[in-house]
């Protein structure tokens, strides 16, 4: 009888423990002053190019800081590389950018597991064109130059809580760059993870 009772107590404790870890505890989500680290990979959307063209990619890391009512600010360091076709040669365009911005919730489910955000940010950085080489392989001179760039970004984001502290993100952004000699508007899509602490 005592052996059966021990087994039932152990089984009940295991079930209670499993339930505690499997049920979301939303009290720990989106707390004001909560911070997070975000890592994303991105793909630039280039008119006339395949969606996942070789050597067209980006990556970024950001720090987030939650304010009240599920909104947050962020600072992001980002690198993006694109190939611009010229005859049989690809001219490399590389951007190293720093963004500072604000995201505001637009829509969420009742359980606060899925959020849609809209936001804006300011950016600045350096754009390198063809590794600063002025001559192309066919002898043509590249008139566009490397520059410091600045501008603004509009963001859209879908964020899903995988656990109370880990989110899966899918983002779209449209960058408006000034100071550049090529493509002032640069859309991109990205996906990644955020770890809140």
Q: Where are the predicted features?
A:
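Cleavable N-terminal export/targeting peptides
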Residues: 1-33
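Short glycine/proline- and aromatic-enriched beta-strand/turn motifs that initiate or cap beta-hairpins
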Residues: 26-76, 194-196
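Residues that define the transmembrane beta-barrel architecture of outer-membrane proteins
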Residues: 33-35, 53-59, 92-98, 114, ...
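Residues on the lipid-exposed face of transmembrane beta-strands in outer-membrane beta-barrel proteins
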Residues: 39-41, 59-65, 98-104, 120-124, ...
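Extracellular loop and loop/strand-boundary signature of outer-membrane beta-barrel proteins
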Residues: 46-49, 84-91, 138-144, 175-180
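Gram-negative (and chloroplast) outer-membrane scaffold detector with strong preference
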Residues: 62-137, 166, 195-197
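Predominantly the C-terminal beta-signal and adjacent terminal strand-loop region
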Residues: 80-83, 157-197
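Short, positively charged, low-complexity/disordered linker segments
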Residues: 136-163
């Amino acid at each position: 009888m005592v052996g059966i009772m021990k087994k039932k107590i152990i089984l009940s404790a295991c079930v209670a423990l499993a339930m505690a870890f499997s049920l979301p505890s939303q009290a720990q989500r989106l707390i004001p002053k909560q911070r997070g680290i975000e890592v994303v990979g991105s793909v630039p959307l280039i008119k006339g190019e395949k969606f996942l063209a070789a050597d067209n990619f980006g990556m970024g890391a950001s720090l987030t800081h939650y304010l009240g009512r599920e909104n947050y600010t962020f600072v992001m360091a980002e690198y993006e590389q694109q190939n611009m076709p010229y005859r049989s040669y690809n001219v490399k365009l590389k951007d190293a950018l720093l963004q500072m911005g604000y995201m505001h919730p637009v829509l969420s489910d009742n359980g606060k597991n899925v959020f849609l955000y809209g936001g804006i940010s300011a950016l600045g950085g350096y754009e390198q064109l063809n590794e600063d080489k002025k001559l192309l392989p066919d002898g043509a001179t590249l008139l566009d130059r490397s520059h410091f760039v600045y501008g603004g970004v509009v963001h859209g984001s879908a964020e899903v809580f995988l656990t109370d502290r880990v989110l899966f993100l899918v983002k779209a952004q449209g960058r408006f760059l000034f100071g550049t000699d090529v493509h002032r508007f640069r859309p991109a899509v990205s996906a990644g993870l955020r770890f809140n602490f």
